[in-house]
Amino acid sequence: MKKIINPWIGLENEGYNCFACAPHNPCGLKMEFWEDGDDIVSYWTPNDNFQGWIKTLHGGIQATVMDEVGAWLIARKLQTSGMTTNFNIRYRRPIPTGENVTLEARAHLREQKKMFAIIDVTLSVKGRVCTEAELTYYCFSKEKAIEEFKFRGCNIEE
């Protein structure tokens, strides 16, 4: 597994402050990502500030984590930016919060049709799938990704 370098680091003065992945956002999730073969993975500890119910991770935060790992799949595997156009989620079991919980978010590109990518995402705790989703992303042209979204390519650490 190789760590993915955040391509937006250094763009804070141009507006980069993503709730999910900006390491400097004081309210954010501060997610980091790894490439694991064909998959993109993030390991994240959901602290108690992200509860929906007592010691239970809020469903909207789960959706955010899934959407973000899908976006990073687009960035790393397809080398562009995109936007979510469809999101179907299934909550199978609650995800606990707390310092001793490590959540694995895993995204896999199922299919690409022209400018659309269909991505399967799972959230697991201790190897047990808690939430799963199918996401559809519209993938921007490389030119638009560069010009409008400051995309400079997405690389891994050596």
Language model regions located:
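HotDog/MaoC-like acyl-thioester-processing domains
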Residues: 1-9, 95-97, 108-158
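A conserved, well-ordered hydrophobic junction motif at loop->secondary-structure transitions
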Residues: 41-65
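Hydrophobic beta-strand-centered segment that forms part of the acyl-chain substrate-binding groove
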Residues: 69-104
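Hydrophobic residues in beta-strands and at strand termini
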Residues: 44-46, 91, 139
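Non-catalytic linker/capping segments at the edges of enzyme domains
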Residues: 1-48, 149, 154
